[in-house]
């Protein structure tokens, strides 16, 4: 009986170590700050409205003339930003007319941006040339850290340019790939040789 209890304790200890390790690896989300010129709450629609809004969390910042949200609980909320939408993520700045933003577990999940076009610039001190791109529709996935450009997509790095109907830019890796080929348009890459002296 004593041997059984000893084995049971040992088994429970071994079972709890991975759980403890997983709990220690998980980081708490960073605090979210929200500043607005004005706000109002519509009890009938259960929506919150803002003007002159700025939301910041770590290296993420979202600014817009106006916004509406399904609530202030960032556990799971949907936001629509409109008018001079500007999103900063690390060294990347995205500009659009409107943006639909999803927050889950107190962190940015996805952003769907519309513009004529919606554009981005990725500035990096380690790189001599900025990367720029745009399309009518941009979709940012925070977990994958990718920016998908569809409908008139283009991306340039210096004098080199990519064009297509679906391009994907990996912010961390600074890589461009073509997405779906279902639109029937090929990816066109223009590479200009450096000027000769």
Give the residues covered by each predicted segment.
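Mature-chain termini and adjacent capping regions
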Residues: 1-197
